[in-house]
From Swiss-Prot:
SUPFAM superfamilies named among the record's database cross-references: Sm-like ribonucleoproteins
Keywords: Ribonucleoprotein
Record protein name field: Putative snRNP Sm-like protein
Domain of life of the organism encoding this protein: Archaea
GO cellular component terms given for this protein: ribonucleoprotein complex; Sm-like protein family complex
Organism: Thermococcus kodakarensis (strain ATCC BAA-918 / JCM 12380 / KOD1)
Annotated Sm domain residues: 4-76
InterPro entries: Lsm6/sSmF (IPR016487), LSM_dom_sf (IPR010920), Sm (IPR047575), Sm_dom_euk/arc (IPR001163), snRNP_Sm-like_arc (IPR022901)
Assigned protein family: Belongs to the snRNP Sm proteins family.
One GO process term, biological-process aspect: mRNA splicing, via spliceosome
The keyword Ribonucleoprotein appears for this protein: yes
Amino acid sequence: MAERPLDVIHKSLDKDVLVLLKRGNEFRGKLIGYDIHLNVVLADAELIQDGEVVKKYGKIVIRGDNVLALSPVELE
């Protein structure tokens, strides 16, 4: 049986993810929460521009209607 999108996101809990926003911003951090509206909570969040960290945050909440994509990240 095919997985549903929220099942894939659930498997990413407590793992590093990359969140792409509609305005072109990218955040990387540990996914510690989400809901059915794709509001996400990241711990140790970082703002990424051109592949480089430009600002570090602690815990942040990103409103779901700003999210374009959410992807697991494998850190080296």
